[in-house]
C-alpha cells in the first residue's frame, strides 16, 4: 500500500501565516505628536480603500502591498479509515475492519510565496504559490478472526493480525490558493484571524487535495527608539480542515517491497483460521449450535474471514490497485507562538512555532512591503 495510502494522505500543511502587520490605532499622551501628524497627513496611495480617512482618524497603516517568502517544516499525525480496495478494475472490498492503520505520519518541507494587498484598512487579501517535498510513513496490518474458543458453551473469537507491513513514500507537490486576514490593532495590541484555501496537486491523486486553514492570533507590538522599528510577539491557534475523501489507481509494482510474499503468507493464515473456525463450530453440541450468540459469532467470523481471503486472493493476481479512503488530521487544532522583527515599514522577518495537538511546525519568513 505504499502509494495507495501514503501519497494520498499527505496533506500539504506548509501554508503558513502571513507576516504580522495590521492597522494600529495610535493612543496615549506620549503619542500626541504622532496623532497630530496623522490627522493632517495626506495619504499618498491608492489602497487601502478609505486609507486617507482612517489615517486622519489616528490609525498608522502599513504599506498597502507586499510580497513574502516563507520556509515551512511540519510533522503531523493522520487518521485513516473507511478503506475500500479493488484489483484490476474489479469490485471494491470494504476493508475498514480488515486493514488497520497503526501509525501515519506526514512530514513536509516547503517554500511558499505570498503577494498581498490591503483592500480595506482592516482586511488583507493574499495569494499563495507553494512547492514542497513530502514524506509519509505508515504502519498497517491485515486482521482476521482468530483465537477461537468455547467458554461456558459460547463461541468466542478475537481479531488477530495475519499480515503486518510498513512503508515510507516520498513525493513532491504544488499548491495554489488565496487567503484573507481581518485584523485590528489598538495601542500596539492586535488581533488577527488568518483564513486561507489551497488546492494541492499530487500526481498520484485523482483530484487536487483541498485544505482550509484558520489561524487566530492575539499579540502585542513593542516599539524601539528607532522610528518604524519594532518587535511583535503573539500566541494563537492553527486549525486544519481538509477534504477527507481520496481515491486513485496504482500499479502493483508501486506497492511495498515483498508484497507477493506478504500476501501469500496472509492467505495461508486466513486458510488456517477458516479451518479453525469450522473445527470450533463442530466441537459444539446441537443445543449449543442453536444459541443465538453462537450462530452470530460463527457467521460473523466466517464472513470476515471470507472478505479477508477474497481481498488477499485478488491481490495475489493483481496488476493494478484501485482505492477509496478517508483521511484527516489526528487533531484539527494546535497551539502557536510567534515573533516578528520589523526593521522598517518595508522589511520584516518573522518566525512561528506550532506544537501540541499531534502536529509540530516551524515557519520562518521574510517580507517586503511597498505603497500601492
What are the functions of these language-model segments?
Residues 20-79:
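Outer-membrane beta-barrel biogenesis signature
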Residues 63, 105-111, 170-178, 206-214, ...:
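Residues that define the transmembrane beta-barrel architecture of outer-membrane proteins
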Residues 79-86, 137-144, 202-209, 245-252, ...:
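Outer-membrane beta-barrel translocator domains and adjoining extracellular loop/strand segments
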Amino acid at each position: 500500500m505504499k502509494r495507495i495510502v501514503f501519497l494520498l494522505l499527505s496533506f500539504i500543511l506548509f501554508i503558513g501565516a502571513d507576516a504580522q502587520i495590521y492597522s494600529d490605532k495610535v493612543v496615549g499622551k506620549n503619542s500626541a505628536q504622532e496623532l497630530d501628524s496623522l490627522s493632517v497627513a495626506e495619504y499618498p496611495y491608492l489602497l487601502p480603500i478609505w486609507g486617507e480617512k482612517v489615517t486622519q482618524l489616528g490609525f498608522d497603516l502599513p504599506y498597502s502591498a507586499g510580497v513574502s517568502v516563507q520556509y515551512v517544516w511540519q510533522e503531523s499525525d493522520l487518521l485513516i479509515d473507511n478503506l475500500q480496495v479493488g484489483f484490476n478494475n474489479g469490485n471494491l472490498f470494504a476493508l475498514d475492519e480488515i486493514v488497520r492503520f497503526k501509525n501515519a505520519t506526514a512530514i513536509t518541507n516547503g517554500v511558499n510565496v505570498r503577494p498581498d494587498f490591503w483592500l480595506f484598512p482592516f482586511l488583507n487579501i493574499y495569494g499563495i504559490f507553494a512547492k514542497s517535498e513530502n514524506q509519509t510513513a505508515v504502519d498497517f496490518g491485515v486482521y482476521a478472526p482468530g483465537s477461537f474458543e468455547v467458554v461456558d458453551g459460547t463461541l468466542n473469537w478475537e481479531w488477530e493480525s495475519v499480515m503486518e507491513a510498513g512503508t515510507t513514500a516520498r513525493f513532491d507537490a504544488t499548491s495554489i490558493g488565496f487567503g484573507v486576514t481581518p485584523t485590528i490593532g489598538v495601542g500596539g495590541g492586535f488581533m488577527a484571524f488568518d483564513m486561507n484555501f489551497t488546492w494541492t496537486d499530487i500526481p498520484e491523486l485523482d483530484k487536487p487535495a483541498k485544505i482550509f486553514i484558520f489561524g487566530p492570533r492575539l499579540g502585542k507590538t513593542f516599539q524601539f527608539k528607532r522610528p518604524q522599528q519594532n518587535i511583535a510577539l503573539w500566541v494563537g491557534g492553527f486549525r486544519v480542515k481538509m477534504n477527507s475523501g481520496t481515491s486513485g489507481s496504482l500499479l502493483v509494482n508501486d506497492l511495498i517491497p515483498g508484497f507477493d510474499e506478504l500476501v501469500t503468507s496472509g492467505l495461508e493464515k486466513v486458510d488456517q483460521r477458516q479451518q479453525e473456525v469450522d473445527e470450533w463450530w463442530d466441537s459444539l453440541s446441537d443445543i449449543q449450535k442453536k444459541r443465538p450468540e453462537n450462530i452470530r459469532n460463527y457467521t460473523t467470523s466466517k464472513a470476515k474471514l471470507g472478505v479477508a481471503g477474497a481481498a488477499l486472493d485478488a491481490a495475489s493476481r493483481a496488476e493494478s490497485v484501485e482505492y477509496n479512503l478517508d483521511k484527516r488530521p489526528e487533531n484539527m487544532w494546535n497551539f502557536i507562538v510567534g515573533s516578528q522583527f520589523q526593521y522598517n515599514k518595508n522589511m520584516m522577518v518573522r518566525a512561528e512555532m506550532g506544537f501540541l495537538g499531534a502536529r509540530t511546525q516551524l515557519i520562518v519568513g521574510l517580507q517586503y512591503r511597498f505603497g500601492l
